[in-house]
């Protein structure tokens, strides 16, 4: 196909330029409209938060839905520190701060027993038992996770880690190597491991199994059960029952 030259080509270039300008104007206009609508929606959500503050704080399902909606429209509680934020309107900054303080206390109280690695589900269950007097379970695991996330500006003291698909709170500086992570994932699935289990499933040498198990025991992440035919290594966090956690917490 021959390329057009002369006046006709110039006209085509002018048309293309005009189309581009019109397109940019439309995009800018639509962007402004969307931004305006989003701002209106955010203000409406803040008003809703103020009107339903009590229910948001006390009803975990209602709060979880509200949080998801707020995050979708850009009201992130861990980014926005403004007094005009939806979280400030409903008092959720203070709420998550209070939850974080309680999470810290539970983690510190159980460090000697679990090596500073405690599952989010255990922390959530324990805190909810403390609130039975209110007649409802007002904390969800997502609340505990958000509370731990809110501690990030304070430094790396509390970190969320995922082991075998389950979330844990690490409250002690701890670097785990690949073998140690593999063993902890197996413990999360089975409840315990033995040298035979590790050798059969991962084809490890006996010396390798002993080394990694001893390392985890020294970190208080595994407890030894020598009553069976073969020595078993149980996950420390799985062995701490609720009564033990309550005792530790009350006497911390």
Swiss-Prot record:
UniProt keyword annotations, A-Z: Cytoplasm, Endosome, Membrane, Nucleus, Protein transport, Transport
GO biological process assignments: karyogamy involved in conjugation with cellular fusion; late endosome to vacuole transport; protein transport to vacuole involved in ubiquitin-dependent protein catabolic process via the multivesicular body sorting pathway
Membrane topology listed for this record: Peripheral membrane protein
Keyword presence, Hydrolase: no
Pfam family, one: EAP30
One GO cellular component term noted in the UniProt record for this chain: ESCRT II complex
Predominant cellular place of this UniProt entry's protein: cytoplasm
Localization (cell): Cytoplasm; Nucleus; Endosome membrane
Subunit and partners: Component of the endosomal sorting complex required for transport II (ESCRT-II).
The family this protein is said to belong to: Belongs to the SNF8 family.
Function: Component of the endosomal sorting complex required for transport II (ESCRT-II), which is required for multivesicular body (MVB) formation and sorting of endosomal cargo proteins into MVBs. The MVB pathway mediates delivery of transmembrane proteins into the lumen of the lysosome for degradation. The ESCRT-II complex is probably involved in the recruitment of the ESCRT-III complex. Negatively regulates meiotic spindle pole body maturation via indirect regulation of the pcp1 gene. Required for efficient entry into pre-meiotic S phase.
Protein name: Vacuolar-sorting protein dot2
Organism: Schizosaccharomyces pombe (strain 972 / ATCC 24843)
